[in-house]
Amino acid sequence: MDLYEYQARDLFEKYGVPVLPGIVADTPEEVRAAAEKLGGVNVVKAQVKTGGRGKVGGVKVAKNPDEAEEAAKAILGLDIKGHVVRRVMVSGGARIAREFYFSVLLDRANRSYLSLTSVEGGMEIEQLAVEKPEALARIGVDPIAGVDTTKATEIARAAGFPEELVSKVADVFVKLYDVYKGEDATLVEVNPLVLTEEGEVIALDGKVTLDENAGFRHPEHEELEDKAAADPLEAKAKEADLNYVKLDGQVGIIGNGAGLVMSTLDVVAYAGERHKGVKPANFLDIGGGASAEVMAAGLDVILNDPQVKSVFVNVFGGITACDAVANGIVKALEILGGDANKPLVVRLDGNNVEEGRRILTDANHPLVTLALTMDEGADKAAELAAK
């Protein structure tokens, strides 16, 4: 789960990372009040879960409350890479002498953690990695040993920090790692980490991604989820405990097992090239227990997507036999009734497949078409979606 900047800032403050004062606001009037409370020069920053805000007018400096209110009027409602700004943070200003970069993230390839650090912060890290890879220090972090003062000092020196700053930035690195470890994050990033003209080291902007698989250890993280901004279909699927990701196509996909669903997406995309370029509309993995209720919940989510024109149900019977899946589909269609109004192509294979096909054939539902192979099913679903 990606956090907004203000949420990351609050976590930083919790762990003792030096940050500027900040107040969240939803209206220009609230922004004015926040600027009056903070006093001095402030920065009004769009709260969206994407980068590049400053390049499109999502970050504005305000010298007084009037300017802060006007900045909010310009920023609120702004579309930044598909993210509509509904909230801003009014942050205190800082006189910046230098900008740095620091992050710690999950290194999946090496089954470890990795710190990325540079004395050239402020620019996008992807751009820095391409244009000046030598300016980015990559230091592995042992998940058991973590980042203590000794390790943080090693990181700071490897990145080329001036010796007089090493102890200061090392202290901040330790605290940022504490955020990473303590909150079960997969990414903690500060860009920029700044040195002010007064000699302070401050996290000026922050990005945090939390591991949702560790949510059982952090019930408080549920409060960080922005349900209002979530895709309504994804929110509905989450309530039903379904593994669903919305895409931009026209063929709804239901399968059991992430590998099979991913393969189905590829086959449907390939078939769509022959049928007006239609594409998969979603990823939906119903898992091993394809009960009537689970199937109904999955179909309910997909059929409520106005972009979906057809649905491809692709199931390989294993622990859950194909006859149980077929009964689930029939009962799901009964449960949904008139809400089931788009054609379904069903491909079953594996355990008890013949009985599963017989059940669907005997049901003779007008919306259901049986396919013997995945390729055949994908082609038929793409054809129906293209009509």
Swiss-Prot record:
Binds 1 Mg(2+) ion per subunit. It comes from Leifsonia xyli subsp. xyli (strain CTCB07). NCBIfam families: PRK00696.1 (NF001913), sucCoAbeta (TIGR01016). Its cofactor is Mg(2+). It catalyses: succinate + ATP + CoA = succinyl-CoA + ADP + phosphate; GTP + succinate + CoA = succinyl-CoA + GDP + phosphate. PANTHER family: SUCCINATE--COA LIGASE [GDP-FORMING] SUBUNIT BETA, MITOCHONDRIAL (PTHR11815:SF10), SUCCINYL-COA SYNTHETASE BETA CHAIN (PTHR11815). Belongs to the succinate/malate CoA ligase beta subunit family. Succinyl-CoA synthetase functions in the citric acid cycle (TCA), coupling the hydrolysis of succinyl-CoA to the synthesis of either ATP or GTP and thus represents the only step of substrate-level phosphorylation in the TCA. The beta subunit provides nucleotide specificity of the enzyme and binds the substrate succinate, while the binding sites for coenzyme A and phosphate are found in the alpha subunit. Pfam families: ATP-grasp_2, Ligase_CoA. This is Succinate--CoA ligase [ADP-forming] subunit beta.
